């Protein structure tokens, strides 16, 4: 495939909710025939991309930029100077790379490279996979060549329904076929009902408390295993694990990057309502209890979760309704009604068809071709 040295710059970062979709787009471009060396990732020096970007194997640049805090914070004093310097650095980078297209996946880390693309006349695509677009997505959408959205009814200009970016390994996942090997890899028993709790790279304190309480209530259950990803910053406060010898098996992990294996191994997941998580659950057909983060801008995680829950493709519990008793009751109900669990999984998989369609990569390539033809 004939293309300039850099075909695409993919930008966005800070949290796994932006970094993983960015890397998913990079994977999709490679699967479409573009050379790995022709895809350049741009993120921040402070987010999870400091670990994920080097491991992914793409050329990358990490800029010194921080997000604007909603509350009064000394970090806000550094926001504007760092943003100006990062944008200048991004402009220099873009002049050297001369990409055919820039893909913005949102978050404060995506602003410098996208603004530089706009100033240099490089066509860019805004990828918005939340029901309610974030601030950077809304700002950048005004001059975008196209906006790729995951849900119907987007207010963004030139919006096209493409589904959300999902990693190739997850798109191809067969949960039933891969479950035995996934459980071996994660050291989970084959004969227990496995609940995986994973609430993003930072974890979730309120969910962690509810899970800890639920584990205490179910301490003598020999038919249940809980694989709890508490978040690295919460490991020190986490309850001790239980080996399952005479009751529940409870595994506590700070961070887990083997999400395909976790989706395959789990009978049921407990998650937050980030758009990337919702798209992955649907793509693989994994039944889940979704507890939206109440601190999300405009409470958009509730809207994301409703995309599945209103189709009977997930259970939605808002955080103010969550405790160990409620969580345990919902898990018990699904554990002993496998027919209902299977229906939820099937409806989730049906909802994920748009994310498995490949339409997002097709849109990006079309924008790149149109830009080159100018």
What feature does the model see in each segment?
Residues 5-13, 36-82, 320:
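Conserved nucleotide-sugar phosphate-binding/catalytic loop shared by glycosyltransferases and other
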Residues 353-374:
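C-terminal alpha-helical cap of glycosyltransferases
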Residues 120, 264-266, 282-291, 311:
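Conserved donor-binding/catalytic loop of nucleotide-activated donor transferases
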Residues 340-354:
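A short, well-ordered alpha-helix in the C-terminal region of glycosyltransferases
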Residues 89-102, 110-125, 138-143:
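Glycosyltransferases and closely related glycan-assembly transferases
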Residues 52, 178-184, 188-269, 302-306, ...:
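Donor-nucleotide binding loops and adjacent catalytic segments primarily
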Residues 40, 59, 118-180, 185:
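Active-site-proximal region of nucleotide-activated glycan assembly enzymes
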Residues 99-101, 256, 264-278, 286-287:
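Acidic donor-binding loop of glycosyltransferase active sites
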């Amino acid at each position: 495939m004939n293309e300039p040295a850099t075909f695409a710059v993919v930008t966005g970062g800070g949290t796994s909710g932006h970094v993983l979709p960015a890397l998913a787009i990079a994977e999709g471009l490679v699967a479409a025939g573009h050379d790995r060396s022709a895809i350049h990732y741009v993120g921040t020096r402070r987010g999870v991309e400091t670990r994920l970007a080097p491991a992914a194997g793409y050329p990358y640049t990490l800029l010194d930029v921080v997000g604007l805090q909603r509350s009064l914070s000394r970090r806000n004093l550094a926001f504007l100077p760092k943003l100006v310097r990062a944008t200048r650095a991004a402009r220099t980078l873009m002049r050297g790379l001369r990409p055919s297209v820039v893909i913005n996946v949102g978050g404060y880390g995506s602003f410098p490279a996208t603004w530089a693309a706009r100033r240099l006349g490089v066509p860019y695509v805004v990828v918005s996979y939340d029901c309610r677009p974030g601030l950077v997505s809304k700002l950048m959408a005004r001059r975008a060549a196209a906006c790729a959205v995951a849900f119907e009814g987007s207010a963004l200009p030139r919006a096209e329904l493409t589904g959300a970016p999902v990693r190739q390994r997850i798109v191809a996942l067969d949960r039933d076929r891969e479950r035995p090997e996934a459980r071996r890899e994660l050291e989970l028993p084959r004969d227990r009902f496995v609940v995986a709790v994973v609430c993003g790279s930072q974890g979730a304190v309120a969910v962690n408390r509810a899970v800890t309480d639920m584990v205490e209530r179910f301490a003598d259950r020999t038919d249940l295993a809980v694989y709890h990803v508490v978040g690295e910053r919460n490991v020190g406060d986490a309850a001790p694990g239980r080996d399952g010898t005479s009751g529940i098996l409870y595994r506590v992990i700070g961070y887990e990057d083997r999400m395909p294996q976790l989706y395959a191994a789990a009978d049921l997941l407990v998650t937050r309502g980030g758009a990337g998580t919702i798209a992955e659950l649907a793509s693989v057909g994994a039944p889940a209890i979704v507890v939206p983060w109440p601190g999300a801008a405009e409470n958009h995680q509730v809207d994301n979760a409703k995309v599945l829950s209103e189709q009977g493709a997930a259970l939605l519990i808002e955080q103010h309704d969550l405790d160990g008793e409620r969580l345990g009751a919902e898990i018990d109900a699904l554990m002993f009604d496998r027919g209902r669990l299977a229906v939820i999984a099937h409806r989730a998989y049906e909802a994920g068809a748009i994310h498995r369609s490949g339409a997002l990569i097709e849109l990006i390539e079309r924008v790149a071709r149109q830009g080159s033809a100018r």
